[in-house]
Amino acid sequence: LDAGFREQLYSYTDGHPLLTVEMVRGMQERADIRRSRAGLWTTSEPLAWHQIPTRVEAVIAQRIGRLPSDLQDDLAVAAVQGEEFVAETVAAVREDDGVAGRLRVESRMPHRLVAPSGAFRIGDQLATKYRFRHILFQRYLYGRLTAADRLRLHERTGTTLEALHRGSADPPVVDLAHHFDEAGLVKPAITYALLAGQRAVRMAANEEAVRILWRAAELLDTLPETPQRDERELEIRVSLSGPLMAVGGYASPEALRNGRRLRVLCDRLDPSLTVGLALSGQTYIMSVRALCSETADVSRELVAVAEKLNHGTLRVLGDFGVGYAETWAGRLSAGHRYLRRAYEIYDPDRDGWLGLVTGQAVGPE
């Protein structure tokens, strides 16, 4: 059993002897871990980390069963938020002003199930955060909810978070995407997943951005094809381009697949800033594959889009693309002419934001 297994086991048990023994015993009984011919313990994939061992589940059920029914309901709603939750969100979902008091009392008990983990403000309102003392408490409470209850509570939690953070400059877009996704509400889930992915791009959290934006694309695939749907997909895939190239390289299969789909969408849609950014992304992928002619052709398309929109930033990208492609192809005079024009119209104050969108430094080098 490698270090990754041991770290994961510890994260689920916190080193608690009973939990550790029962977790490992359950894996042995399910043959999730078994001895190899060499006598070493090995794992099968995927491991059922979320399956609570029977004896542990019985202990948790006994502890929770001793709580007042109102507090049990509070904690069940809290479990929908995850291991850490906000008391005010639970109170709003339950429409019960007594939630905060019950959680405060429970957090002070000797054998408490939750503990305070901080406070922050949502506008002028104070919000209190709690954490389940162990992830297994949260998993047990969430696991005993019916499928209908999960859908309902995820929707209520999502709409409550929307209301609490309305007008906020930094809403919890990751949480909102998760709750609407789990509630089966595809359109708001896509909206918030796109925002969460774009925020991850700005933070250079490329692997996280890829994970979130791929999920947005998967959800979009469930919707009927319309021009509005295509525009949203184009926006998602443009946001994906930079992180995919950062994680897997310019010519990775995922980046190429994303690029092919972008090409289809660009051909369908009218000129726009997003179409221009998509074409620019195509030039990056083509250029690293030494496809000089194709790079020049797509860059000229980008120049045409920029002219139709009278968009200086897109014109910089298009001229640079044509200029570099012509230079690589040995047509130095033509290449210099385009590069010179791009250099002259480049405005760092106007064009600097593109690096956050494309994952590329934009402008003269």
What are these regions (language model features)?
Residues D2-R211, R215-P224:
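Short secondary-structure boundary elements
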Residues D97, Y140-D347, D351-L354:
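Inter-helical turn/loop elements of alpha-helical hairpins
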Residues Q125, E231-E233, G359:
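A general secondary-structure signal for short beta-strands and their flanking turns/coil
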Residues T358-E365:
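Short, intrinsically disordered, charge-balanced linker/junction segments flanking boundaries
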